[in-house]
Amino acid sequence: MSMLDGEWAKAVGAEFKKPYYRDLYNFVRDEYATHVVYPPADDIFNAMHFTPLDKVKVLILGQDPYHNVNQAHGLSFSVLPSQKDIPPSLQNIYKELHDDLGCDIPNNGYLKKWADQGVLLLNTVLTVRAHQANSHQGHGWEKFTDAIIEAVNEQDRPIVYMLWGRPAQSKIPMLTNPKHLILKAPHPSPLSAYRGFFGCKHFSKANEFLKEHGVEPVDWQIEDI
C-alpha cells in the first residue's frame, strides 16, 4: 500500500498512526495474502496520487471498487484502459455527459483524464475481495476516507461535490464550507438512473460554478483509445 505524499500527507498523515488504521492495515494485508483483492495494492491510493489536494476542484464519491478482474485501479467509476466492457453505471454517466454537454461516448472507461484535471474520484472503501461486493466495508476504510473528505472540505476555494445515491449523500453533514457546491442525484446504476440521474446536468452545473468563480472548467470528454 504505497502511502500518500505532499499536501495529502500533511492533511491526513496522522490517520496512519491511529489504532483503527493499524487494524485496517493488518486486515488488508492479510486479505491480499490469502485472497484475490482489487485494486492491485500499489493502486489503492491512486485517487490521491493522481489528484493532489491543492488541485481538487470536483469530488465524485463512489462506494466500493469494482470487484471483477482487470477493472479497479483506484479511481471511483473508472476501469483500466485494457477493459473493453464499460460498467453499466459508467455507461449511464457517459449517456448523461452526452445529453448534458454533447460529449461523444468513448470506447473505454479510463477516467484518469478527469483525475489529472482535479476531479478526485474517491471511493469510500478502497479495497474489495474479488467477486464479493462490499466485502471490505466496516473495517476502517470509511473512517480514513472521511478524513480525506474533511481535508477537501477545509480547502478555501471553490469545489464541487457530485453525490450520487444515498450512501454518498450521507456525507453531506460533513460538507460545511460555504465556498463549495453540493450536487445531489440518484446513483447512475441501471436500478436508479431513470429516477433522476439522467437529466441532472451535474457536469454542466459544475463547470458553470467553476467558471463563475474564475476556475478552469473540466474537459469531461474521454477520448477513444
Curated annotation (Swiss-Prot):
Query: Gene Ontology terms, cellular component aspect?
Result: cytoplasm
InterPro entries attached here? UDG_fam1, Ura-DNA_Glyclase_AS, Uracil-DNA_glycosylase-like, Uracil-DNA_glycosylase-like_sf
Query: Which one GO biological process term can you cite for this protein?
Result: base-excision repair, AP site formation via deaminated base removal
Which SMART domains did the record assign? UDG (SM00986), UreE_C (SM00987)
- State if DNA damage is listed as a keyword: yes
Superkingdom is Bacteria
* Pfam families listed in its UniProt record: UDG
Compartments, as annotated in UniProt: Cytoplasm
Keywords for this protein:
Cytoplasm, DNA damage, DNA repair, Hydrolase
Gene Ontology MF: a single term: uracil DNA N-glycosylase activity
What is catalysed by this protein? Hydrolyzes single-stranded DNA or mismatched double-stranded DNA and polynucleotides, releasing free uracil
**Active site (catalytic residues):** 64
Q: What EC number(s) would the UniProt record show?
A: 3.2.2.27
Q: Which HAMAP family match?
A: UDG (MF_00148)
Family, per entry: Belongs to the uracil-DNA glycosylase (UDG) superfamily. UNG family.
Function statement: Excises uracil residues from the DNA which can arise as a result of misincorporation of dUMP residues by DNA polymerase or due to deamination of cytosine.
Give the protein's recorded name. Answer: Uracil-DNA glycosylase
Per the UniProt entry, what species is this protein from, by scientific name?
Agathobacter rectalis (strain ATCC 33656 / DSM 3377 / JCM 17463 / KCTC 5835 / VPI 0990) (Eubacterium rectale)
Q: Which gene encodes it?
A: ung
